[in-house]
Amino acid sequence: MLKVVISSPVATQSGYGHHAREIITNLIERKDAEWDIKLLSMPWGHTPFTYPISNDWKRRIIPLPIQFQPDIFIQITVPTEFQAVAKLNIGVTAGTEGDICPAEWIDCINRMQIVVVPSKFTKEVFENTAKSSNKLITCKLIVVPEYFNESVYTTLNAGGNLDILDQIEEQFAFLSVGHWLTGNIGEDRKNVSGVIYSFVNTFKGKKSMPALILKTSGATYSTMDRMDIENRIGQVLDQPIFKNTKLPNIYLLHGDLTDTEMNSLYNHPKVKAMYSLTKAEGFGRPLLEFATTGKPLIVPFQTGQKDFLNEEFIVEVKGQLTPIHPSAQNEFLIDGAKWFTPDYGHAENLLKDVFDKYKNYIDNGKRLRYHVNKGFTKSAVQPKYDELFNVITEFESKIPKQIQLK
C-alpha cells in the first residue's frame, strides 16, 4: 500500500479549502483501498478553520514535520510552496489571476511531476509565461474543473434558516458575493468596491430602487473585520457624486454561512440576480453555485469563469484588459500583468435593464442552469478525474516498490 500525504487548507473557509475538499473526496473514493492516505491541515491566510470535516478525515490528519517519506505527496497551494518530498509529487493550484505569473513560478511547478489546475485560463497563464520567459514546462499540466454539489445547490433544497433576509424591505435585490481584497476603489480583485459604486450610481435618486445584498468579508469573520468592511463601504458612498441624494439600500451579510445557507441565500425569493464585476478568477465558485438557481447572472465573460459560463446565457459585462493597479499588486499579482476592467457605463445600463425588464432575462437564466447541471456536477466532471488518475497510474507504475527478501 502506497503512503500518500495530501497537504492543503482542508478545514478553512476559503476557495482553496473548497477545492481541496473536492480533490480529497475523489482521491479517497477512488484510491483508499490502494493508498494509505494521510492529511496535513494547513492555514490559508487569515481565513478561519471553521469548515466541518468528517471524523474519518480528522483521523487521517498528521502533524508536521512528516516523519516518513511519502510515496506520493500532493500539495494544494500556490506554486511557490511546492516541494518535491516524495517519489511522485503532485501540485494543485489556481495560479494567479493576472494574465501572466512570475517567471520563477515555472521553475516552481517544474518541481512536481504533475500539476492540476481548475481552469483553462490558469493553464494558459502558465503556458504564456513560460513562452515569454523562454522557459520550458516539464511537468504534466492537467485541467480538472471544480464542480458544485448537486445535492446541496439546487432549487429543490432552498430551505434553510435565513430569517435575517426578512428584514429587507425591498422585494427585488441584486446579490454580490466575494472577499473584499486589497486595492483602491475599483481596483480590488473581486471589484466589490466597483459593484457598490456602480449599483448606487445606477439607482441613486430613483423613485423605485432595488437593494444590494453584499456577502463579503476581508479575511476573517471577526467584529474588527466587519467594522473594516463597513468603513470601506462608507468610503465608496462618500464620493461627491452621491452627496445630497437618496441612495439605494445596501445590506451587508458578514459571517460564516454553511453550504446549505448559501444555497438558501442564492434561491431566496428577494434575490433576483447576481451581480459581479470580478477582474479575474482562477475558477469563480460562487458564480457557478449561483448559476444553479436559474436566475440572471450579470458578470464579465473572462478568465476562469469562462470554462463553466455560456456567453449566450449570461448578462455579459463588457470591458477591457488593463494593467493591475499598484494598490492591488503583490507577489502573485505582479507589475506588468493585466486583468479585466469593466465598462461601468455598460454595467450600469445592464443593471437598470435587468431591474426594469426582469422577465426578459429569465429564460437565459434557466438555460444557464441547464448548462451547468449538464457539465459541472460531480458526476459530470468525472471524465476529467479519469484522465487525471490515468496519468497518476502511469507515474505510479514507475515508483520503486519495496520487496521482501526471502
State the predicted function of each range.
Residues 5-7, 44-129:
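Extended catalytic core of nucleotide-activated donor transferases of GT-like folds
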Residues 296-299, 315-316:
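Short hydrophobic beta-strand element within catalytic cores of glycosyltransferases
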